[in-house]
């Protein structure tokens, strides 16, 4: 993997933070999807590598069903990209969910 990175140069790098601010009756995953669709303004097809971070407070952990929904949603959006995901905690989030996206597009040197 390291050899591949050494022989490539990033053409584009993008970082977005999307935090859930649910409307009345909206689940936090639905809020993330809405926020992404309405405000993220990302041309998903130009990126070939995506890192997803799903961050919650430990008292309101990410449920397996939420994780499955989010991974499926972003996999469909970045359907040509290789992606990885990870989870983390931040107690300041309370009931909210934070999704951090790090997208990159590499080209051979």
Put a short name on every predicted segment.
Residues 1-109:
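Tubulin/FtsZ superfamily GTPase core signature
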